[in-house]
Amino acid sequence: MHGMILRTLAALCFASIGLALPASAQEIVRIRGTVEKIDGPLYVIKSRDGTELKLTLTDNPLYVAIAPSTMADIKPGMFVGSAGMMQPDGTQKAIEVHIFPESMRGTGEGHYDWDLKPASKMTNGNVEQSVSGVDGPVLSVKYKDGEKKLVVTPETVVVSYVPGNKDEVTPGTKVFVAAKKQPDGTFQAPRITYGRNGAGPAF
């Protein structure tokens, strides 16, 4: 059982890299939306802009769950990622913070453009320290070629990545998918990242 868990987390690490790399580097389309219906291998997803998209998965797909967490779960030494907006003082106001399991350390490490909102950024790195700030806790996150201070406000969504399973993805589930468009207009992906217990991928 322990070995199976380790293998699952290792696969999660490998397959989740697309979550945190620039789209141009992956030649992928990031789909954010809600599962409307499931017809055999076909997932019908309504994107945030109301567009209906059809998605299939590759063989042996990976299901990655997003579980609700809190700032209390973030400790120095953990590897985290955050989508947010840069502020005039050089800090990054976090829209969300996702906590990686140790097996995923290094995934998408760095600071780069993200497509959640205009001018949004993604920062993935190691938590050096957490201090109190005027607007909320401030995480010092160090990556291979720099460091950013992430301001975590009461509105910031904090979640953790955990191994998931197919049965949890049902109509109404909020999902994030990094997919490739197929010649027939459908999309295909090796994994689905989805919200568990009401959580939704905020990135």
Report residues per predicted region.
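Bacterial N-terminal signal peptides that target proteins for export
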Residues: 1-10
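Short, flexible, surface-exposed loop segments at domain boundaries
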Residues: 2, 18-203
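Bacterial N-terminal signal peptides
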Residues: 9-20
